[in-house]
Regions:
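Catalytic cores of carbohydrate-active enzymes across secretory and cytosolic contexts
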Residues: 1-256
């Protein structure tokens, strides 16, 4: 007789008084808002480090006792109220007055395409300077309220961890990202169905899932080729940041 194994994950119920933590975890504004990140750190600094400073991952693992006790901690709740007030005020801001002289928020839209975006280590789809620059552009654009969307690729494996073996050689260690722990969600069409798009790839069609994330005021879209109807080769297009060979890189550029 073969035993069946089930994997269960017990998650805490975030108290209504702290429901704003869920909002914070789903907006990459936390990547440049130190006060927002500090709330998670203050709840459980050890877990915060273990989760690689990932708010969504943190909220899935924090103990029920800790979040329940926090609602009775007057000092924490005062800081929580200040952070949420600042967060809501930021999102309510309109376009910076100087931007209005050059762009019409109702009719103009800037589209920014990049192979990587480095906003925060909890969203590992970047490797270096290009990604950090693109991420900083998104943050600055959000602060200014410019009508703007960012478009990139959603990699299952982003930057690698560098380790040194016993012989002094650098060893690259890749970690697969669990999308459920990223501040993203599927894009829906007018019927409320999950949106896929199709791209011609030299004689055949590649299907791509469309995901979206919010970084302050900046809306970001990401494409993901990990769909069963695609060939294994095409599913590799968004498997790893700068992975594969020249052909893979060209396919990534075509998708963008």
């Amino acid at each position: 007789m073969t035993a069946t194994t089930f994997q269960l994950e017990v998650r805490p119920q975030i108290p209504k008084a702290l429901s704003g933590l869920i909002e914070l975890s789903n907006n990459l504004l936390y990547s440049w808002d130190r006060n927002a990140r500090s709330l998670f750190y203050r709840l459980d600094h050890t877990l915060w480090e273990q989760c690689d400073h990932n708010p969504k991952g943190f909220l899935r693992r924090v103990s029920q006792q800790i979040v329940d006790d926090a609602t009775n901690d007057n000092i924490f709740m005062e800081e929580y109220s200040r952070v949420m007030s600042s967060f809501n005020s930021y999102l309510a801001k309109n376009t910076h007055h100087e931007i209005d002289d050059y762009l019409d928020a109702d009719n103009d839209l800037i589209a920014y395409f990049c192979a990587e975006f480095g906003l925060h280590e909890s969203f590992p789809i970047y490797s270096g300077g290009l990604g950090i620059l693109a991420g900083d552009h998104c943050k600055a654009i959000s602060d200014l309220g410019v009508p703007f969307v960012a478009i990139g690729l959603l990699y299952r494996q982003g930057y690698f961890n560098q380790e040194i073996d016993g012989y002094g050689n650098q060893v690259a260690s890749y970690k697969t990202t669990h999308f459920s722990e990223l501040p993203i969600k599927r894009v829906l069409n007018d019927k409320g169905e999950k949106l896929n798009i199709s791209v011609d790839m030299g004689g055949h069609e590649v299907q791509l899932k469309a995901w979206t994330a919010q970084a302050g005021h900046t809306t970001m879209y990401f494409l993901d080729s990990n769909i069963q109807t695609n060939s294994e080769e095409d599913r590799q297009i968004t498997f790893r940041l700068y992975g594969g060979d020249k052909t893979t890189r060209i396919k990534q550029e075509i998708v963008l």
